[in-house]
Regions:
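Negatively charged
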Residues: 2-108
């Protein structure tokens, strides 16, 4: 799923509740550059096997709502710059809501 929606800068909404992510290991750059995306619910994603989430939401500067409530990040070894390019207000909200996100995810 790496780079699946890469640079889809006109994408404003996305319904991906039926995605089967059971065998996915790489979600890096998945929503990279989706600068018009405002909210995203990916709580249904099975992330048990994911090891890479670097740059996943890089440049998602319009993102205000993100549901990661069921994310299992135990096997993730790379979260670098996951939220780089997002607003500080959004990053602070994610930090407060999800304690399992490593600090490297918020690097600029």
């Amino acid at each position: 799923m790496s780079g699946m929606f890469y640079e889809c800068s006109s994408l404003k909404e996305l319904v991906i509740s039926n995605f089967n992510t059971n065998n996915v290991t790489d979600m890096g750059e998945m929503f990279y550059g989706c600068s018009s995306l405002k909210e995203l619910n990916i709580s249904n994603f099975n992330t048990n096997n994911v090891t890479a989430m670097e740059l996943m939401f890089y440049g998602c500067s319009s993102l205000k709502e993100l549901n990661l409530s069921n994310f299992n990040t135990n096997n993730v070894t790379n979260m670098e710059y996951m939220f780089s390019g997002c607003t500080d207000q959004f990053k602070n909200k994610i930090r407060a809501e999800y304690k399992n996100i490593k600090e490297e995810a918020f690097n600029e």
